[in-house]
């Protein structure tokens, strides 16, 4: 994948993995647009990197996804890469009652938004040079963590969708890339919950190197192990991981 001279939209780009990728694309010579729900986080990102273009957008809402698409192709007609990175993770006890709206929001952000945005942008991307859709899934796509059941299920769904999307677009110029993180030391799910994870810069540097080499499925650490495991190995990983984090 050519890393310079692109125009890239990254959802959830004001923090975590999205922000780390945005920094690296910018340093490589690409134009970067980041969007997110929180205006304060976007301001902080722009203070650090004034070259960033920012847009407040809650991708959980269908109308805001459409508005994002219309704004992006109007303001940045050369946009050629969409990175579906935005995600939330919640611990959920399925035996307890909860507000269904919270589950619905997690599904919308983690699965519906990347599917919808991919379909919105596809006709535009097909007319650009070096177009790509990059979906950020998870090692939990392959082995669910039982205390984050909705997150795990949405990432499994997004992995499946990414495979189908890549197949359907195989005769078009649009490249479909999947980034599969392990636990990374970000604030996903809450501040301090992933301090045991891989350092963010270590993961982002690895991803960027693999993008440069042209890889289309980029997994790291425990996520790489899970993505290549046999069914018997997956069962063992599931048992061990869920005993550790119960």
Locate each region found by the language model.
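Conserved glycine-rich cofactor-binding loop
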Residues: 12-16
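Residue(s) in the substrate-gating loop at a strand-loop-helix junction
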Residues: 138
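C-terminal helical subdomain
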Residues: 178, 186, 190-229
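Active-site helix of classical SDR
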Residues: 118, 154
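Conserved mid-core segment of classical short-chain dehydrogenase/reductases
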Residues: 89-104, 147-150
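The beta1-alpha1 cofactor-binding region of Rossmann-like NAD(H)/NADP(H)-dependent oxidoreductases
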Residues: 56-68, 100
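Conserved glycine-rich Rossmann-like NAD(P)H-binding loop of the short-chain dehydrogenase/reductase
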Residues: 28-44
């Amino acid at each position: 994948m050519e890393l310079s001279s692109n125009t890239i939209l990254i959802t959830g780009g004001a923090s975590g993995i999205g922000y780390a990728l945005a920094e690296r694309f910018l340093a490589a010579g690409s134009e970067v647009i980041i969007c997110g729900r929180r205006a304060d986080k976007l301001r902080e990102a722009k203070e650090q990197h004034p070259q960033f273009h920012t847009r407040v957008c809650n991708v959980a809402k269908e109308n805001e996804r459409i508005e994002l698409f219309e704004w992006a192709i109007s303001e940045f007609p050369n946009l050629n890469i969409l990175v579906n990175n935005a995600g939330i993770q919640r611990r959920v006890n399925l035996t307890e009652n909860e507000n269904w709206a919270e589950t619905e929001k997690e599904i919308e952000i983690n699965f519906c938004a990347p599917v919808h945005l991919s379909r919105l942008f596809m006709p535009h991307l097909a007319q650009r040079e070096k177009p790509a859709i990059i979906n950020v899934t998870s090692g939990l796509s392959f082995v669910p963590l039982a205390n984050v059941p909705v997150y795990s299920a949405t990432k499994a769904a997004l992995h499946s969708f990414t495979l189908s999307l890549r197949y359907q677009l195989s005769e078009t110029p649009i490249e479909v890339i999947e980034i599969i993180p392990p636990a990374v030391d970000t604030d996903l799910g809450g501040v301090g919950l992933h301090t045991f994870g891989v350092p963010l810069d270590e993961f982002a540097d690895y991803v960027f190197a693999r993008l440069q080499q042209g890889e289309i499925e980029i997994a790291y650490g425990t996520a790489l192990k899970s993505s290549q495991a046999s069914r018997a190995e997956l069962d063992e990983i599931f048992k061990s991981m869920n005993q550790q984090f119960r």
